[in-house]
Amino acid sequence: MRPEVKICGLKKPADAQYVNDAGADYAGFVFYEKSRRNLSRQQAEEIMKKISPRIKKVAVTVSPDAAQIKTLQQMKFDIIQMHGKLSEDAITAAELPVWYAINLSDPEEFEAKTKSF
């Protein structure tokens, strides 16, 4: 079985060719203002046009609200990856598959952070 690969943090249109050539399964686009990899909608859409149709596009967010989820869905992402705190509104608004990234300092935190699922 081949592992699936996501290349994340794309910043410019030229990055799309790298993702295409590398054979990645997923391309990650960061939407978090505190990140140096943060993109505007316009930047992301320009890069997305150059991504091969076989590569799934992942919107990476931190503590998104329902409005941000709806905007990302309009942009034709395939998956939404959420970090941070999740609101019930954001989860309810998500009509796409959701990946929830959890940072743990010890295994006991897993149950506490995932009991709402």
Question: What are these language model-derived features?
Answer:
Residues M1-F117:
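Conserved N-terminal beta1-alpha1 strand-loop-helix module at the mouth
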